[in-house]
């Protein structure tokens, strides 16, 4: 039966009018389209003309159909006049077997329907028995009662409550139950309950809660750790040896090496360690500290701790000053060496000859040039500060100076005492 229905649907193209014709042919009644077709063809005999509704379908249809809406007519009614559909829909060439009592009752129209329900009930003949049939039919045709008792019961009707979404309340199945009036059910998404204060919100405040800022013993680190360190009178912070107590802090001396926060960096040389061990007894020696190299066999002494640190980098091979020029990356021990190296990249000429206004990148180049003028040595740089860094000692500075010959002329102010112009040039 299902295969024949699918063939009929494919033949008529799923048109509502064609489906109506096929439904009417099942019931043995005459269709206006089929009658008009037979008249247009000149009295062609219909293969199902001898079938009558009271004889063949007496078991399923005890009463004839009502013809109030003109869609279905009883077997004895006269044929309808021909219409414009005669040529569009030729007669169906197949013959249908006579109806028997063993037909599927799910394909037939329910018995208690009125004439006003004829149009919706026509399509029920093409519908297969579906487990969800009673659900969507009840929602679409609210006035139609459910089908016969042998229709399979949907799986949700097996529950005693009738509605598995409801809280055990007896309601009808499907959409019909939702449309019925009754006590309001609780929503599917109830309002969230109030959680205790232990749960933090999803979007915390940009500032911490007040109870987290209160001081208490539960904090691991003491608050004194975050206090700023004391700054000396000179406004400078302590150096790398800040972990050690400042020198002279307990003596109260004001003229010591680092007493009363002089701002000088601490030193680890043997002399400074000895002065630290002596304490107040060496207060007189702190006025002029001497920093000596502790490397055996060196014994160099410097007046500043920074000079000693620069000297110690020669022993350790440390080169903390790196050239950041592209693809260079050279490292140097002192900052003045790095500065002199960078000028080779920038081509800066900061040393100028006072006589011919020539410029040079290095001071030794200027000194060599000034000897061509018959002058004793390099003049001071125009900017004022020395080219050499603080890390260079006095002995190293003297070693870098060009040697003076014994036959070099005397300074112009002595040789030419009466020429004030040359003396002013050299005194700048």
Curated annotation (Swiss-Prot):
One GO biological process term: response to insulin
Positions annotated as zinc finger (C2H2-type): 291-315, 321-345, 351-373
Residues with the N6-propionyllysine modification: 41, 45, 358, 368
Protein localization: Nucleus
Cross-linked residues, Glycyl lysine isopeptide (Lys-Gly) (interchain with G-Cter in ubiquitin): 55, 227
Location of the motif 9aaTAD: 153-161
UniProt xrefs under Pfam families: zf-C2H2
GO cellular component: cytoplasm; nucleoplasm; nucleus
Region called Disordered, residue ranges: 30-84, 229-257, 364-428
Domain of life of the source: Eukaryota
GO molecular function: DEAD/H-box RNA helicase binding; DNA binding; DNA-binding transcription activator activity, RNA polymerase II-specific; RNA polymerase II cis-regulatory region sequence-specific DNA binding; zinc ion binding
Post-translational modification: Propionylated. Depropionylation at Lys-368 by SIRT7 activates transcription factor activity and positively regulates bone formation by osteoblasts.
This protein's UniProt keywords: Activator, DNA-binding, Isopeptide bond, Metal-binding, Nucleus, Repeat, Transcription, Transcription regulation, Ubl conjugation, Zinc, Zinc-finger
Disrupted gene: phenotype observed: Death in the immediate postnatal period due to difficulty in breathing. Mice rapidly become cyanotic and die within 15 min of birth. New-born homozygous show severe inward bending of forelimbs and hindlimbs. They develop a normal cartilage skeleton but fail to form bone and to express osteoblast-specific marker genes. In endochondral skeletal elements, mesenchymal cells together with osteoclasts and blood vessels, invade the mineralized cartilage matrix.
Tissue-wise expression: Osteoblast/chondrocyte specific.
Induction: In response to ascorbic acid induction, expression is activated by NFE2L1 in osteoblasts.
Family (UniProt): Belongs to the Sp1 C2H2-type zinc-finger protein family.
Subunit comment: Interacts with RIOX1; the interaction is direct and inhibits transcription activator activity.
Domain comment in the entry: The 9aaTAD motif is a transactivation domain present in a large number of yeast and animal transcription factors.
Known function: Transcriptional activator essential for osteoblast differentiation. Binds to SP1 and EKLF consensus sequences and to other G/C-rich sequences.
Protein name: Transcription factor Sp7
Organism: Mus musculus (Mouse)
